[in-house]
Amino acid sequence: MKTKQLVASEEVYDFLKVIWPDYETESRYDNLSLIVCTLSDPDCVRWLSENMKFGDEKQLALMKEKYGWEVGDKLPEWLHSSYHRLLLIGELLESNLKLKKYTVEITETLSRLVSIEAENPDEAERLVREKYKSCEIVLDADDFQDYDTSIYE
């Protein structure tokens, strides 16, 4: 299986995940819009630098361990290029805006009151079941009562 070539180094993605821990998997449109707006802003690098201290603590610890980077240090030079940030935006939208397929079950409830002559309630229910199974009683759209949906992941 061929893996997709990323537009930036692992270090760049690690930096972005300080601010956006779900950067690579984000699918909420409002969050994606915020990421795109920030990356497209000419003042992006300054904003990222100033806000790193509020970022994900685990990711900040990883940055220190992996790259020796601490809050206040310079961000990767690669992020300073508007062109490079546009590449990130394109990659982000291409991979995260894909529609996903879901299976949804629809359950309709049809109901009809049926009168039948019988010796007792059990026999009445048995006779109605037999008539229903043999298609002597057919429920249709006029018998619709309710519906429900359930999602399967």
Curated annotation (Swiss-Prot):
Keyword annotations of the record: Restriction system
Short name of any one Pfam family annotated for the protein: DpnD-PcfM
Coiled coil: none
InterPro entries: DpnD/PcfM_C (IPR025575), DpnD_N (IPR056487)
GO BP terms: DNA restriction-modification system
Other noteworthy facts: Encoded next to the DpnI restriction endonuclease.
Name of the protein in its database record: Protein DpnD
